[in-house]
Amino acid sequence: MLQQVQEFNHFRLATLKDIKYLAPRLRFEDKREILSTAGMTPYTALYYSYLKSEIVFTIVNTKKEPVGIFGITVGGAIWLLATDKLKDIQYSFLKENKKVIDFLNTKYKILWNFVDCRNSLHIKWLKWCGFKFINKKKYGVLNEPFYEVIRICA
């Protein structure tokens, strides 16, 4: 599976150096989502997510600078955190991202997670990727409203 990662533009395998670079630069909405779900600092949440994920991609711009990070756990929980600079490559990212999601859905028949109801960019991304919003409930350490999302590969 990891050998096939090289086929995707704007994605490369993540490193711990990427986490250190991205953590202080994350979007306000992503920092708020991290705080609401886990009560962690951005660095701690990224590091923990990196360790718990089977595969983690760094999203890079045309200069190969990290602008986001994206992963999937062994159980199929998909996640994405980004900087404001992701908007600079939004169209090419979305096009390529759909290929990555389809690729991941060949290994994981069910992709899922929770998204903060206030994180409109993540909600748009999940809809673009074909996720269904199946539940709205209080979630995380701050008990904020989140949507439960799922994408099933037929």
Q: Where are the regions that the model predicts?
A:
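Conserved acyl-CoA
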Residues: 96-111
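A short helix-loop-beta-strand connector motif used in the catalytic cores of GNAT acetyltransferases and
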Residues: 46-58, 68, 109, 144
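A short, internal acetyl-CoA/4′-phosphopantetheine-binding micro-motif in the GNAT/acyltransferase core
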Residues: 79-95
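Conserved GNAT-fold acetyl-CoA-binding loop/helix
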Residues: 28-46
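Conserved beta-strand-loop-alpha-helix junction that forms the acyl-donor binding cleft
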Residues: 108-127, 132, 138-142
